[in-house]
From Swiss-Prot:
EC number(s) given by UniProt: 1.11.1.6
Positions annotated to bind NADP(+): H194, S201, R203, N213, K237, W303, H305, K306
Function: Catalyzes the degradation of hydrogen peroxide (H(2)O(2)) generated by peroxisomal oxidases to water and oxygen, thereby protecting cells from the toxic effects of hydrogen peroxide. Promotes growth of cells including T-cells, B-cells, myeloid leukemia cells, melanoma cells, mastocytoma cells and normal and transformed fibroblast cells.
Entry's Gene Ontology cellular component terms: catalase complex; cytoplasm; cytosol; extracellular exosome; extracellular region; ficolin-1-rich granule lumen; focal adhesion; intracellular membrane-bounded organelle
Keywords, comma-separated and alphabetical: Acetylation, Heme, Hydrogen peroxide, Iron, Metal-binding, Mitogen, NADP, Oxidoreductase, Peroxidase, Peroxisome, Phosphoprotein
GO BP field: aerobic respiration; cellular detoxification of hydrogen peroxide; cellular response to growth factor stimulus; cholesterol metabolic process; hemoglobin metabolic process; hydrogen peroxide catabolic process; negative regulation of apoptotic process; osteoblast differentiation
UniProt subcellular location: Peroxisome matrix
Name of the coding gene: CAT
Protein name per its UniProtKB record: Catalase
Species whose genome carries this gene: Homo sapiens (Human)
Amino acid sequence: MADSRDPASDQMQHWKEQRAAQKADVLTTGAGNPVGDKLNVITVGPRGPLLVQDVVFTDEMAHFDRERIPERVVHAKGAGAFGYFEVTHDITKYSKAKVFEHIGKKTPIAVRFSTVAGESGSADTVRDPRGFAVKFYTEDGNWDLVGNNTPIFFIRDPILFPSFIHSQKRNPQTHLKDPDMVWDFWSLRPESLHQVSFLFSDRGIPDGHRHMNGYGSHTFKLVNANGEAVYCKFHYKTDQGIKNLSVEDAARLSQEDPDYGIRDLFNAIATGKYPSWTFYIQVMTFNQAETFPFNPFDLTKVWPHKDYPLIPVGKLVLNRNPVNYFAEVEQIAFDPSNMPPGIEASPDKMLQGRLFAYPDTHRHRLGPNYLHIPVNCPYRARVANYQRDGPMCMQDNQGGAPNYYPNSFGAPEQQPSALEHSIQYSGEVRRFNTANDDNVTQVRAFYVNVLNEEQRKRLCENIAGHLKDAQIFIQKKAVKNFTEVHPDYGSHIQALLDKYNAEKPKNAIHTFVQSGSHLAAREKANL
């Protein structure tokens, strides 16, 4: 292996060396029939037409035509790896989940890192939140902790999620990323201020995937063996140390090595530098939740660590690269509704929305039997239920067992110990407007107390450098929001915008919009 090449670059050579003592496999069709000639199609004479009987060609071409599956609507670009979670501290007083059963217990895991808004071919070094999803293969089925690298999010009501993502994606006419769309949405929804401030800070462009923290972000509920429950948040802190990329380095890498994050993770694991994260929880009792100064289920806010300290739980360690990217990373499906006994959902509205949205998009992208795909299969649990058939049913379809319940033939029975924790709710049923639920207090604390002067300066520069491409009226709305956080925050951004706006005229792509018709006025006049 050439000394100048990294393991990712030498993957093909490494594969060959591993098989050096083996004879080459016999080339076959998808049905296993040996292939005599893979380089030439069957024709009538050297210049004649192809024959339909050339099943080697049709088998190859038909499969090629169907290689791609729908891209994830968000988190399309990603890297994956496998490893284990090891318990280092006892939290059984909070949760009966088997994953936390005893100190020293190891549970296999799969992890996928990702950017959010970009397509599958986009650069790893863009300013964007990072997905940090963990699948725990437990004896009680899979637990999917579908987190990000930030403890907060842009919105607190799931009905806004499609519009939020649309604003971050491409303009429906120009098919270009549109700063007007991005900043118009953010400026109209000031609950985004906290996440926007985090995003445009130094941590907005992590140095690969190994040097960033992860967060479950949502509020969850833990239930112990006595049926006692608490609310919790999950944190996983990088043991490699936080490292971020400068704007300049990120821009350079996006051209020189757009797959920088994937390459860095693969090479680290291939050379035995296994990345790890220390796993923590925060705990809040139900009584504390009742007297908390704000909604403890609000995804745009954090729980202060001084009041709700981090409690160590264990370690996440990644020690295996994917054997095949498509099989183990592109097809992996994380679902927040996959929660074994001892871990449950809270009233967090965004979490509640994701409980439906994630399995729904997996059924669209991968098919209704996506849990049969090996990387998604809960292989450490025995799956026994009354679900049958459907496209791509890849197992024994549970044989001749009854497919209805209840029945009198000894088929799977319900497990009372798996009953969810009961809780009583009362209140008015309506659509509650949460747009103005204190959008600035924690952002102000972040700006004043967490960031130093140099970091605040870079934050304002990063925001202004992006906001400058939006229209002036949108700039004004955004600056007004930042000013409400802190006068200096708004004034520094405005000063930078004034400089940008004085240096060059605003460029705009004008489109004709008319309700109920796609025809421009001139086109209609010519009808």
